[in-house]
Amino acid sequence: MESEKSASGDEQRPSHAPAAPASPLAAGEFEILILSLPEAAARRRLVHAQLDFPGMPSYRVLEAVDGRALDERALAAGYDEQAAIRHCGRPLTRPEIGCAMSHLAAYRTMLERNLPLALVMEDDALIGLHAMQVLRRLVRMIDPSRPEVVLLSRVGRTSAWGGRKVDRNHRLYRVHGANGAYGYLITQAAARTMLQALHPVRTPADDWRHLMRARIVQVFALVPYCIGIAALGENSHIGEDRFEAEGARTVGRWLRKYAYQKFIFQLFVKPLLRLRKHASTW
């Protein structure tokens, strides 16, 4: 099925995507916001191949920001380099900046369209076989007025304390360590607080630990996860530059991290929080 273009330039599914709703979606429903660069034709084909079916939620493809193409004026308006250095110990790479701006644009779309909940996905996300059935159960458990994010991708660790049952096979746990922003549910309240806290950009889009520590949002994970990453996602627009930037961090910073992981984390944090590590299953 070929998608149309909205007035804003975003693609939207003709048979399902409603025009700016004045009232929230029905209980158990949500809209999907896909972030994709205009030239990412193969990735967009993957999106349509997964979502262009009767009974699937409405979705729209939002034009992502290519950080490599930003001019100096746009960069100065949307990115705070000094804040990034204070927070991350280094400037963000251009692809990281573009990615973070793209996710903030998705949050603005949520507020403009009065969406109580949205599933934000990057265009290399791979949706699990029964994901939508699980998500329709899950969204009924979420209060849109609370600033909450639920990661649907694989996470590093979760705490076993206070897990909530979603269905016979899935539970919701608090996140302790996670990277990646290619598939997550977000409430309208979380979109609002993240826009206020993260603009101009000063952290990567997937710095969930910072968001939790700063009490900007609460972050949970669905276990087992229901959104993976396609093979084409290995050729990330962000990955290589990010790894090079991470490698440039000071020796002292790495030594402090090593000491924490080797001693404090293993002896105190891990047993106290009953942390569980999650392996890749698909």
Where are the language model's segments positioned?
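An acidic/histidine-cluster motif and surrounding catalytic segment
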Residues: 2-121, 125-282
